[in-house]
Amino acid sequence: MEGLKIKYGVVMNGKKVLRIMRKYNLMAEYIRKSKKKNKNERIEDNVKPNLLNRNFTTDVPNKVWDTDVTYLIFKGSRAYLSTIIDLYDRKVISYKISKHNDNKLVMDTLNEAISKRKDVSGLILHSDQGFQYTSYEYKAICESNGITISMARKGTPIDDSPIESWHSLLKKETLYNNNITSLENYIILVEEWIKFYNTTRIKGKKVNKKR
């Protein structure tokens, strides 16, 4: 009973205090500790419907974007790649790489994409239901720029297949059959490949015509 000792200079064990409280029908005040909210927890109220329904084609640029975060892993070391592509031609609009999978990674990617494309009002931005995409920060950025949020159904990667396939292609062509010696070396290779993809590998609007 540390409180009694500090406040009144009285030393008394817990059992004696309990007997006295029972005798006089006293109740101890119990302060419930508030449960800490996981900062990486999905906010259910911010989950949006799937507006694409697996229709991943569009006839004009800057109408539908697809985004996701993926792992870059090399010998136990890990980084995270956040990417936004335009579904018109599958071109990478913006990307960011970080050692931390947090809201900042996604917001930096989104803000850069908006800065590059300027007028994005009326755009649909599609993603999965990851915690960054259901965050209030993500919602606020989209709403303030006239962007409509669309989300794949929970646990359904095929609903977000363009960006999933793009990340798979990137890993296939960078991680395998290359003399990578460190995660930092891998990240450099990823950045070089993205530049190559956007300038050389991409086939423009033919991508959409094939689908």
Please place each PLM-identified region on the residue numbering:
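Basic, flexible linker segments flanking DNA-binding modules
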Residues: 1-60, 156, 211
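Mobile genetic element proteins and their domesticated derivatives, centered on retroelements
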Residues: 1, 17, 21, 52, ...
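C-terminal domain-tail junction helix/linker
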Residues: 139, 143-147, 169-211
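Short small-residue beta-strand/loop micro-motif enriched in glycine and branched aliphatics
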Residues: 89-95, 150-152, 176-177
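Active-site beta-loop-alpha junctions of metal-dependent nucleic acid enzymes
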Residues: 96-118
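An active-site-proximal beta-strand-loop segment
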Residues: 58-93, 99
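RNase H-like two-metal-ion nuclease catalytic core shared by retroviral integrases
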Residues: 40-41, 127-129, 135-136, 149-171, ...
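Conserved, non-catalytic sequence blocks in retroelement Pol enzymes and Pol-derived host proteins
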Residues: 6-9, 56-58, 74-75, 129, ...
